[in-house]
């Protein structure tokens, strides 16, 4: 695992891909240290395995939902830096990188695959601002990811067991 890789050139990225190195993108740390914004979209297009990390030494957040949204925001900054040529991460992509991509490193399967132990949280979004129209499940998920606070988590499932 290599953290950040903000300034890896084409030769280094090719070596990272060939060696099967996992890049831990730590957007919060990169922003706090003013070290740059990783070209995550470019790395993904090159076939580099990217996951998300908090790098609490330089980052400021441990909750993965905050790491995910920070990574999406950082990718939007990268889009501006590249004159709009590099697409930013979507919420589903950020969620995948912050969950399944890292889980795979430890031998876990894809997402909510049959036979895989459940890892999930239950979110009460009742105190989130009302929308002017009914939200789809995806829109509620996206809103929850950005507005979530610890008190909104009403249940936690880990390895198929409810732990909260």
Regions found by a protein language model. Give the residues of each.
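His/Asp/Glu-enriched, well-ordered alpha-helical/loop segment
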Residues: 41-130
């Amino acid at each position: 695992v290599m953290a950040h890789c903000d300034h890896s050139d084409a030769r280094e990225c090719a070596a990272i891909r060939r060696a099967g190195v996992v890049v831990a993108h730590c957007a919060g740390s990169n922003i706090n240290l003013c070290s740059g914004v990783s070209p995550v979209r470019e790395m993904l297009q090159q076939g580099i395995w990217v996951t998300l990390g908090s790098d609490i030494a330089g980052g400021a957040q441990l909750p993965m939902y905050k790491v995910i949204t920070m990574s999406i925001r950082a990718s939007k900054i990268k889009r501006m830096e590249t004159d709009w040529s590099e697409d930013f991460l979507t919420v589903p992509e950020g969620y995948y990188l912050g969950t399944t991509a890292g889980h795979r490193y430890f031998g876990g399967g894809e997402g909510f695959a049959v036979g895989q132990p459940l890892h999930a949280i239950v979110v009460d979004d009742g105190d989130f601002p009302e929308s002017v129209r009914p939200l789809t499940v995806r829109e509620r998920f996206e809103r929850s990811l950005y507005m979530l606070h610890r008190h909104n988590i009403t249940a936690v499932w880990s390895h198929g067991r409810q732990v909260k």
